[in-house]
């Protein structure tokens, strides 16, 4: 169960990140490294996390022309990360280029990370989409992007848990959904707009839950993580 909870290391430097990891590594085995931390600390941080036997989701949301994304992704795969993402809005050619890089890595190394397409950020809502010119419903856009990601051969998507059931109905239950914007009832939403509880997210079929500030900003991070894990365990064992 601990592998289905991904704790986001949304901090500015390695010292802060490793403090969090040291406190949580006995209860959580999967950590997300985003732009802020990776751009400061670089690949050495990934090595340090992997040397502790931990899983790493490298959340850089690549978005560029297909050739550039393919070359960048090859370098990220060589870091031995377990999960990486690219923006699905980059289009079919970019998504397919990413798939081909993964396929080459599988042939060359016998393994490759989970590669995800990012649909619509959980900090956005319908109004946010309309402000940048989208005239369709948010859920329709998510469905289109998820379908294109699957057709390109990638493993799954990053999306709000609110869209998980829709995504699974279109792409199948084996298509992976990684869901940020997860909050227990007593937690603040911060800048997230499309949020759900761990219980509801799992009931809808989410495969991985990403949680940042409610855990890493808690006075007792280990206890906060355990509360999330207990709620998740309760759903899977029918006690909630």
Curated annotation (Swiss-Prot):
Active-site residues from the entry: 61 (proton donor)
One GO term describing the cellular component: cytosol
Pathway assigned to this chain's UniProt record: Pyrimidine metabolism; UMP biosynthesis via de novo pathway; UMP from orotate: step 2/2
Reaction catalysis annotation: orotidine 5'-phosphate + H(+) = UMP + CO2
Keyword field contains Lyase: yes
Catalytic activity, EC: 4.1.1.23
GO BP, sorted A to Z: 'de novo' pyrimidine nucleobase biosynthetic process; 'de novo' UMP biosynthetic process
EC category name: lyase
InterPro entries: Aldolase_TIM, OMPdecase, OMPdecase_AS, OMPdecase_bac, OMPdeCOase_dom, RibuloseP-bd_barrel
Name of the protein in question: Orotidine 5'-phosphate decarboxylase
Gene: pyrF
């Amino acid at each position: 169960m601990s592998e289905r909870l991904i704790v986001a290391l949304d901090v500015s430097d390695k010292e802060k990140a490793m403090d969090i990891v040291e406190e949580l590594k006995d209860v959580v085995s999967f950590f997300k490294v985003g732009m802020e931390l990776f751009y400061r600390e670089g690949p050495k941080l990934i090595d340090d996390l992997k040397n502790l036997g931990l899983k790493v989701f490298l959340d850089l949301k690549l978005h560029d022309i297909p050739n550039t994304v393919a070359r960048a992704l090859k370098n990220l795969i060589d870091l031995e990360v377990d999960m990486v993402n690219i923006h699905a809005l980059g289009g079919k050619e970019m998504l397919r280029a990413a798939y081909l890089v993964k396929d080459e890595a599988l042939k060359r190394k016998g393994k490759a990370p989970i590669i995800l397409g990012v649909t619509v950020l959980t900090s956005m809502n319908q109004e946010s989409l309309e402000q940048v010119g989208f005239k369709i419903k948010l859920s329709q856009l998510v469905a289109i992007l998820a379908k294109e990601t699957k057709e390109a051969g990638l493993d799954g998507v990053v999306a709000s848990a609110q869209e998980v059931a829709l995504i699974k109905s279109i792409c199948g239950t084996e298509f992976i959904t990684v869901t940020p914007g997860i909050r227990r009832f007593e937690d603040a939403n911060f800048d997230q707009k499309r949020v759900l509880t761990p219980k509801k997210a799992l009931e809808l079929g989410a495969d991985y839950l990403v949680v940042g500030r409610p855990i890493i900003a808690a006075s007792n991070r280990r206890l906060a993580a355990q509360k999330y894990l207990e709620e998740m365990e309760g759903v899977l064992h029918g006690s909630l």
